[in-house]
Amino acid sequence: MNSSNDLSDELIRRLSVGGALEEVIASEMFEDSIDVETEAEPDDIIIVHMDIREPLSMLKSLVEQKIGVCLNYYTFWLQDAQELESHKNLVDQCVKGEGLVQINVQIQTIRKRINIADVLKPTEAALAALAEEVVGQLSPPETASQKSSSSESPIKTPLKRMHKEDSEEESVEGKDVKPVLNWVLDSKFKREQIRLKIPEAANEWTHAHVTYWLEWAVKQFELVGINMSDWQMNGQELCAMTHEEFNQKLPRDPGNIFWTHLQLLKECNFVSVVHKRAEEQRKPKQPRIMSANSISTNSGGSLSLEQRIMRKSYQSVKSSDSVESTTSSMNPSNYTTIGSGNNGQVQLWQFLLEILTDCEHTDVIEWVGTEGEFKLTDPDRVARLWGEKKNKPAMNYEKLSRALRYYYDGDMISKVSGKRFAYKFDCDLKLLIGYDANELSTLVSEGKTAPERVAATETITEDT
């Protein structure tokens, strides 16, 4: 209360000595009183990927595209301590790094600043998200029949889209081979690239560089029917190749995997491969859905609902026949969704998926239909749960919804038009965690309608 009075007295004093209201509002005195969460809340961080050699004016353009707001007259600052020049790049201004980087920025509207909070090497999750963004912007590769039928009115469709006359099995297979969420940087090629001094930008490659890359790719992607003499070109010619020319040189490219690799190489300047887990998901396998009673551990105890529908993380302890190991592997903390970034911290979309797959939270959030739509039936409660997860007691739905808006320009979550508190997962949940929205909703419903079985499961887990 005293601090509030002091602020009011200071405001009156400055106005009385002739200070303009706008100057007073923009003063340091007024800024220091602003709620820190409003200006620098981690959920307000905008993640941008670009080459560190690009000028900061390029970063401004990318941020403007992400948030849909003009940032004229905004200045660049590094961690609120050093002002940066927009016509220079970060390397010229004492930030070490090379190639593609992840830049975390905050928009400070009062100060009219674009504050660079962090400059990081992209994580696997970040590269995967970037791959999704890049590939999502590409026109889908066309077959000869598609090209002839759509030459008059070309239509951009998702990468996983198939012909209407294709069978249902082929459509499902098309979804399984969708690679955009599971591309990672190939560290082995990167080391060789540094050793052989191959430029990072593919358009700077020589004939020898292209040949070396292609020989690696033939083994990595198991390319068949490829004639090395057809690929005698330099990097500029490689990057300028159309999909029609690509098809002539490589007629067989299941799932457009190698074409996608080439586009990521051209657009992002990194040599990427499909993550091993995604590679396994591309191969035919037994149906994943089993009855609730049939899913059990080595010790005979059924997994709880939440444990059944979450996949083990890569860091999970391998299960063994011992009771101690089995109990440890059943701990819910060992189960997570793919794509955890920011040093293992849970992201908002992961949190929403987590409570959507917990039958205990069906009174605050629920699935709607079978296409990934969900509704916050108690948005304030959901916000409080998110605040508890992030250790932010002041979290409310307004801040939660603002954080959700950063997903709208990607392929993760979107707002359902015309419906209050309704959102939709646009990503391929089947590829991401192994279950689609319909399967998740069914599993949650099973847990809700059979509380005795869920309670018994928990008892078995504790006893074990």
Curated annotation (Swiss-Prot):
Keywords: DNA-binding, Nucleus, Phosphoprotein. Uniform distribution throughout embryonic development, with slightly higher expression in pole cells. InterPro entries: Ets_dom, ETS_fam, GABP_asu_N, Pointed_dom, SAM/pointed_sf, TF_GA-bd_asu, WH-like_DNA-bd_sf, WH_DNA-bd_sf. CDD domains: SAM_PNT-GABP-alpha. Residues 138-173, 281-300 are annotated as: Disordered. Residues 291-300 have a biased composition (Polar residues). SMART domains: ETS (SM00413), SAM_PNT (SM00251). It comes from the Eukaryota. Residues 346-426 bind DNA. PANTHER family: ETS, GA-BINDING PROTEIN ALPHA CHAIN. This is DNA-binding protein Ets97D. It comes from Drosophila melanogaster (Fruit fly). The lineage of its organism: Eukaryota, Metazoa, Ecdysozoa, Arthropoda, Hexapoda.
